[in-house]
């Protein structure tokens, strides 16, 4: 007999840097899940990614308090800012897009980079082909104030 699913939980955790402190600890603890088991499994699964890359994860938890992880690709905005070479700024030391998208340009990327990002995110996007996925990524670039050349 299959395990009974109680629910699922979406988190965005930095690759290889999961720890039991907030937001991970409280989110798992209030559901009675083993926090350290999650931390070890997540860090092991994200060991091949660049450390610090924000990684969305869907945690499905079962009646016997066990869980399974489904890792997603990093957010399109993160990949675009990285491709544009935007420098980290602010208290959280993260790259920022334009404060006024459409009026100010924060950085530029080539169409080839957009295609590469679209191909990487294809499994997580609601698109039938790479061209449709590129349109989604182009919309994200426009929202970040990143100009596309070529």
Swiss-Prot record:
Family matches, as Pfam families: Ribosomal_L11, Ribosomal_L11_N
Keywords noted in UniProt: Methylation, Ribonucleoprotein, Ribosomal protein, RNA-binding, rRNA-binding
Post-translational modification: One or more lysine residues are methylated.
Full protein name: Large ribosomal subunit protein uL11
GO annotation, biological process: translation
InterPro entries in the record: Ribosomal_uL11, Ribosomal_uL11_bac-typ, Ribosomal_uL11_C, Ribosomal_uL11_C_sf, Ribosomal_uL11_N, Ribosomal_uL11_N_sf
GO terms of molecular function: large ribosomal subunit rRNA binding; structural constituent of ribosome
NCBIfam families: L11_bact
Entry keyword annotation includes rRNA-binding: yes
Complex formation: Part of the ribosomal stalk of the 50S ribosomal subunit. Interacts with L10 and the large rRNA to form the base of the stalk. L10 forms an elongated spine to which L12 dimers bind in a sequential fashion forming a multimeric L10(L12)X complex.
Function: Forms part of the ribosomal stalk which helps the ribosome interact with GTP-bound translation factors.
A single GO cellular-component term on record: cytosolic large ribosomal subunit
Keyword Transcription: no
